[in-house]
């Protein structure tokens, strides 16, 4: 009872192209082709905005035809009253705060890049702000909150 391990697979909704994207699918393909040809200078953006637009274009092209969901493995293990929650990507700080708020643990240690790297897991408000991580993320808004919810379920089971 002092040591435990659980794992689950969660189907995470992907951020497929939509009307909220700053660029349409046709433009995304154009920017992707220019970028892959080493012609970023022909894309009408500079500095970090160029990086953001290219990342968004690559995401739009990648998910143009789906899939609607990506299976993601979450893990949790405990040593006594210390819990570790494994997340296969780069969660925003709010994910850590949400997991650490779970009651009954002396310490909760979120561990990123566990069993893979599926990208960024921005909080809902980051999607509303529209920054690089949210615009390039493979996942729909709400992914971070879903990870918190599923991570807490694992912590209850472990």
Please annotate each region the language model reported.
Residues 1-158:
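Non-catalytic substrate/cofactor recognition surfaces at enzyme active-site rims
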């Amino acid at each position: 009872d002092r040591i435990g391990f659980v794992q689950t697979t969660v189907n995470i909704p992907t951020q497929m192209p939509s009307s909220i994207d700053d660029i349409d699918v046709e433009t995304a393909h154009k920017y992707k082709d220019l970028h892959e040809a080493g012609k970023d200078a022909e894309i009408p953006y500079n500095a970090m905005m160029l990086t953001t637009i290219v990342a968004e274009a690559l995401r739009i092209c990648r998910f143009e035809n789906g899939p609607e969901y990506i299976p993601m493995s979450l893990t949790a293990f405990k040593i006594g009253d210390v819990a570790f929650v494994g997340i296969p990507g780069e969660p925003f700080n709010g994910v850590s705060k949400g997991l650490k708020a779970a009651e009954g643990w002396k310490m909760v240690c979120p561990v990123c890049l566990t069993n893979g790297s599926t990208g960024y897991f921005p909080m809902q408000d980051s999607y509303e702000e529209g920054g690089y991580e949210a615009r390039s993320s493979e996942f729909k808004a709400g992914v971070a909150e879903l990870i918190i919810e599923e991570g807490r379920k694992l912590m209850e089971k472990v």
